[in-house]
Structures are given as C-alpha cells and as structure tokens.
C-alpha cells in the first residue's frame, strides 16, 4: 500500500509538470530577475575586476513579447600608471522585448530588446586629485541614452528561466566612451 502511494505521488508530479508547461508566457504574467553584467573589456584579460549587477522586473504581453524595467550598478576600473581609477554607474532602464523565435513549447526563445536609459556616473569616488598629484578632468555626470540587445531565455522549470544576453548601450553625458557593449547572465522567477 505505501508503494502505491509513492508511485501515485510520482505520477501526479509528472502530470502536473506537463500540464503547467503549457502555461508559459501568459499575458500579464510577471517576473523578477537578477543578472551579472560584464563589460566587453572584461573578456580581453585573464582576470578583470569590472562587473555589474542588474535587478529587473518584467510583465508579459502577447506573443512572447514583454515590457521590462531594471536597476543596474556597474563598476569599471580604468588603469592609470600603477593605479586603477574606479568609475561607478547607477542606471535605470525601461523598455520592450520582442520575441523573434522560439520552440513550440516556449522552452527556448530568442528576443530583441530596446531600452531607454537614465543614470548617474561617479568618477574616482568624486575625488579629482590623484595620489601622484595629477588632476582628473573627468567629472561626475548624469547619463541618458538607449540600449539594444539580443537575449536567449531558457526555462529550467515552469517558474525559473536562465537569461543570457549581449547588449550595446549608447550613453550621453559621460566623459568616457559613448558605446558600451556588455554581456549578461542571470535568473528570472516568473509568478
């Protein structure tokens, strides 16, 4: 009798999993994501201290498209003689992602996204004088711009997704480079 209960429970788990699989990408379904962000320059050296973290919120629309909003913190180190000058960016983003292709079960999807960006950049912890007496001409600035990117999403279960993307941001207002490519990897929980 206990063996029958165990087998019944296992069968119900598999049955529930296959039924729930059809409930992916429902309109108005929401998701929270946490991603690690690496600038393209981080891949050119064997080890890099450049990084970023992104917290996102998404709301599904029709046909696998969705609106998304995010807050992102980035830190890059620019070498100067024997020093590294930190540049930190706090960026808010809002945009829309269009489903390009996916398999029939919606387990794997490729999306194209576009976002508007607004943020603030802090150079060397707001200190313009370096230890060797040099003066930084770069200043703290407000940033604004746009970002486009391709993202691959893969469902691990009915509620968890793995996200991998490549993006290029154009940020005006900064005294550093205008175009900033990056790669992200993260997890999203759908509810």
Where are these regions (language model features)?
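Short glycine/proline- and aromatic-enriched beta-strand/turn motifs that initiate or cap beta-hairpins
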Residues: 21-76, 188
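Cleavable N-terminal export/targeting peptides
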Residues: 1-29
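Outer-envelope beta-barrel architecture signal
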Residues: 24-32, 63-69, 106-112, 140-142, ...
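Extracytoplasmic loops and strand-loop junctions of Gram-negative outer membrane beta-barrel proteins
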Residues: 35-40, 79, 131-136, 167-170
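Acidic, glycine-rich flexible loop segments
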Residues: 136, 143-154
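Gram-negative (and chloroplast) outer-membrane scaffold detector with strong preference
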Residues: 56-131, 160, 189
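Outer-membrane beta-barrel "beta-signal"
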Residues: 179-191
